[in-house]
A protein has these predicted regions:
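A charged, aromatic-enriched C-terminal amphipathic alpha-helix characteristic of glycosyltransferases
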Residues: 26-29, 273, 287-319
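Aromatic "clamp/platform" in nucleotide-sugar-dependent glycosyltransferases that forms part
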Residues: 232
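Short His-centered aromatic/hydrophobic patch
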Residues: 78-83
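A short, active-site helix/loop in glycosyltransferases that binds the activated sugar's phosphate group
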Residues: 118-146, 153-160, 311
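Short alpha-helical donor nucleotide-sugar binding micro-motif in glycosyltransferases
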Residues: 117, 219-224
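Conserved donor-binding/catalytic core segment of Leloir-type glycosyltransferases
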Residues: 13, 173-190, 196-200
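Conserved acidic donor-binding segment of nucleotide-sugar-dependent glycosyltransferases
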Residues: 264-276, 283-289
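Short hydrophobic beta-strand element within catalytic cores of glycosyltransferases
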Residues: 249-252, 259
Length: 323
């Protein structure tokens, strides 16, 4: 008889300040996808979420402290550095904190995250790159036992859909070429200006993320001739993998997972942003009525289900050490 899975006998609390709102419904969907995957794999996981913004941190810490006094959780997993500080100050232990990118590279939040890294039971980053400096921005400290725990794409949602069908559902012109910038244009590190410059140079319409409902995002990806990741930096770069999961070409700066995921893939580009080079890569895709790449096989090893398995293994390790 197989031994019972220890995670069926523990309760995990996930803490996140990635709570979505009407203007950014996609925010934090990657955390929610991972939670759902962990539940499907047998773990009992509850979620404590609150909106981003400095006015929310003190009230959230008080509410979290009260929750931890009223209910027992065997492990707390916070996503994003400031949410991690809330959990730490609320007395959460054992505590895992996953750092996602901006919380490491930001000039104000980054130093706070590096201090927090020495005060938790497991430091997790969504990519190895976050442990190294990048363009003068420090990374996370090399805390012994640190882990890499990304949140991967939900392959149940992000899959290849006929481009004509995606455009029909979105009421987009079936004949026109489109580029998709899937991020929120208001986030400066995502560099919407680069995507807009490229679309203008190629004479095509740029579709923009930010206010797209999460369940509709796979339609927008499949409707586009190519997905643009023009960021200055990414923790993991989930948009690149979501495009690949749909077999849609991705053009990306060398950030996050892109150098690994796009290496040697025909129809894709991973290079520093240069208008001439990117235009040359984009034009053949814009001239093709249905450009596709062999991307799904590259996204599969990093799927939400696979990354949930990896995260549950990290929980087992932490609970084994603490116990």
């Amino acid at each position: 008889m197989e031994p019972p899975d220890t995670l069926r006998r523990v309760r995990v609390l996930v803490v996140t300040n990635f709570e979505p709102d009407a203007s950014t419904p996609q925010r934090g969907r990657w955390v929610r996808d991972q939670v759902e995957e962990m539940r499907r794999q047998g773990a009992e996981v509850e979620v404590f979420s609150f909106p981003p913004g400095k006015r929310h941190y003190a009230p959230a810490t008080r509410r979290l402290r009260s929750l931890l006094r009223q209910q027992h959780f065997d492990l707390v997993h916070a996503h994003y550095g400031l949410a991690g500080w809330c959990a730490r100050l609320a007395g959460a232990r054992p505590l895992i904190v996953s750092f996602h990118g901006t919380d490491v590279r930001h000039s104000v939040v980054g130093p706070m995250s590096r201090r927090l890294a020495w005060r938790v039971d497991l430091v997790a980053a969504v990519s190895r790159a976050l442990f190294a400096a990048e363009d003068g921005r420090p990374g996370l400290p090399a805390v012994p036992g640190s882990a890499v725990l990304p949140c991967g794409p939900d392959l149940g949602r992000f899959r290849s859909i006929p481009r004509a069908e995606a455009r029909r559902q979105l009421s987009l012109d079936p004949q026109r070429p489109y580029l998709l910038f899937p991020a929120d244009p208001a986030r400066p590190e995502k560099r919407h200006d680069r995507a807009a410059e490229l679309a203008s140079a190629c004479g095509v319409e740029l579709l923009r993320g930010g206010s797209i409902e999460p369940d509709e995002m796979p339609l927008w990806v499949n409707a586009a001739n190519a997905v643009l990741v023009t960021s200055d930096y990414e923790g993991f770069g989930l948009a690149c993998l979501e495009a690949l999961a749909c077999d849609v070409p991705a053009l990306s700066t060398p950030v996050g997972i892109a150098p690994f995921a796009l290496a040697g893939l025909p129809g894709a580009l991973c290079a520093p942003f240069d208008l001439d080079a990117w235009s040359a890569a984009a034009r053949p895709l814009l001239e093709d009525p249905d450009p596709r790449v062999e991307g799904a096989s590259r996204a599969a090893p990093l799927s939400a289900a696979r990354m949930a398995e990896r995260t549950l293994e990290a929980y087992r390790d932490v609970l084994g050490v603490i116990d």
